[in-house]
Amino acid sequence: MGFKSFGEYLTEETKEVTFGWGRYNPPTSGHEKLFDTIKKVARGGQFRIYASKSNDPKKNPLNFKTKIKFLRKMFPKYARNIMGDNDIRTIFDIVVKLYDQGFTKATLVAGSDRVTEFETLLNKYNNVEGRHGFYNFEGGIRVVSAG
């Protein structure tokens, strides 16, 4: 009977997260459908909703703080999943933060018109150190269409 090394007992736990990112400015009932899709894709796992900080009078009338407040009031069932993180400015900030929080697999739910763009952009920098920071998700970041 041989002794096993400690390493043979270690198994790295897979920790998955599904997320969405958008302007949501102003929030609409259509956004609730997107949030429903994010939850569905997560299959009971963790999911998060991030809003961009875009703010201009014409296309993005609400500032970030007000937008988060409205999103949480309009969609109370998702209030805990709507992230009001002031440090998030880009999609790279999101994936770096998720990786730093210990997630090993990530899925982004995006509009059908942006799936290819996000898939290419995010996976180009998976496991690459750079100005954007560092993240390394197993198999890259999966990007699925919101429908």
Predicted regions and their residues:
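Nucleotidyltransferase catalytic core that binds NTPs
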Residues: 2-147
